[in-house]
Amino acid sequence: MNSLKKLSLVAISFVLAMASADGAERSIKINRQYLNFPVSHSLERKAMTFTVDGRKESRSVIRLAEGAADYWTFRDVSQLRGKTIKITYEGSQKALDNIVLADSIMGGSMIYHESSRPQYHFTTRRGWINDPNGLIFYRGKYHMFYQHNPYERDWENMHWGHTVSTDLIHWDEQQLALHPDEIGTMFSGTAVIDYSNTSGFGRGKDNPAFVVFYTADSPSAQRQCMAYSLDEGRTFTKYEGNPIIDSHEKWQSHDTRDPKVLWYAPGKHWSMVLNERDGHSIYTSSNLKDWTYQSHLTGLWECPELFELPVEGNPSERKWVMWGASGTYMVGDFDGKVFTPITPKQQNLIGSAYAAQTFSNIPQSDGRVIKMAWSRLGFGDAPFNGLMLLPQEQVLVRTHFGGWQLLSRPARETESIFTLAEQG
């Protein structure tokens, strides 16, 4: 409480709070790094809207505490330094006034020291996480985006969080990558590097566009969108032509989501795998903006993946693997437009693992297919929820019955966190 009083006094010089006919309202001049939000689960969620320099930026719901907080969440606003944020809140002015602008995270000294905090698996500092998104290796760093509610430990307000690593074990959490907008909240997707500048977003050979694809979810529909970065994934600009695919009417379904995009070299085009209604569809594009429907395969569900692997022990034999979020997969052939399964559905994930995705853009000199999956474990009253399982390498083997099976092995990087114990 003493810290809250001290920081509130500091904030007086640049904060204007006022009553509004539509609820509480407060304008804050950003000259510190973090907005801190007190959360109380005894309260109902209320809508909170951010407007930056007169432009509506995003809308979320939050349980802002009027008194003592169960815990604090935060938003890094350093990219908005010098700008003014207007926060409109459908709850009380008293709760809104408890938001603290500071150069530190409230309760930050306890982060990673909580009694329930996993030490070897990635967890976010505060809030909820689920599906890994946009896994990609670029210029020496593994980027992992993820489904994230930064304002509460429970699911809601889907943003894209962002973390980076040089070794797949030690992760450095970044600023939020994508915020909800007028099209919807930010559901799952993927990332590519547009080396040939097919989209026109790039700025020369040395600065290709880092492009992410995501689903914008709203009560009326799920639509596919994209954004691009020219600073190696630190900030993103949403494509002004979004959405790039709106197929909910065609399928008469709200379940049209989770784009996975890859470059299909033999055809010199982009391919997208998209969950639509009862299975996975394939779309193609020459420029990442305009997409043409090609085919559909039933039997798999959300968070689609599609990648090629050599058969272990016979590198000249290569097959494609398509899977869904629950870990069911098929092995088959892919011509850039149609995936033809040659095996029945099999199971790769078990237990709490869900929505695994593989890293794109792994150097050919490495050659591995590395996946990360979300674990649906909860942590009770902790101020965070959800974790990512350790990375695994995917291997395709021939079975004794003449078929193919996908195996998962701990990535070699995990050896650094294990110690072999001698047995007497």
Ranges and model annotations:
Residues M1, F14-V15, S360:
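Compositionally biased, low-structure terminal segments
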Residues L9-V10, I244:
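Short amphipathic alpha-helical "recognition" segments used for binding
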Residues I12-A21:
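Hydrophobic h-region of N-terminal signal peptides that target proteins for export
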Residues A24-P259, W263-G351, D366, M372-G424:
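Beta-rich carbohydrate-recognition and catalytic domains
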Residues N361-S365:
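Structural secondary-structure packing elements that flank or coincide with functional cores
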Residues M1-S8:
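Bacterial N-terminal signal peptides that target proteins for export
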